[in-house]
Amino acid sequence: MEKGNYAFIDSQNLNLGTQKMGWKMDWRKFRIMLREKYNVTKAYMFIGHMPEFEDMYMQMHDLGFLVVLKPTQNLKPKVEKPDTKDSEPEEKKPIKGNIDADLVLWTMREIGNYDKAIIVSGDGDFYGLIEYLDEQKKLLHVMAPNWQYSSLLKPYENYIVRIDQLRRELAYFSRKKKQPVKK
């Protein structure tokens, strides 16, 4: 019996990589494509956890992704500000939810359960994982969000699928009806 393939998705790399190219991913279309084109039976989505996005995590789960949440950290130190009307609004704090170790761990932990793996990231931090999967004949593809993937991945160009080249198939379009322009 064929095991099927698994996808391991660096959601931040994918999301930022497509947005940088001026579009948003339609996650439903992406999951369907993974299943139909690449026989992906399980798609693990690694995301830095932020409580205000609980609904999004549930939506991703409902679309067929196995959501793996990683605790996040605020990178800016807390600074007490005086409470005055003239004080500037607080800057948005950068949040870091480093999922790299989790993605590698889950890929290795599940290695006996899938035929081949798809790593969805253009991040060179996954070079060692990709190298190992290739040596074990377990690598199907590396799906990079755009042409700006890490030069460390160049030896694996034969495995690279650029998601930006699939924009027409995978882009999200708002389904809201546009209001007619009044003349």
Task: Label each region the model flagged.
Residues 1-183:
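Terminal and domain-boundary accessory regions
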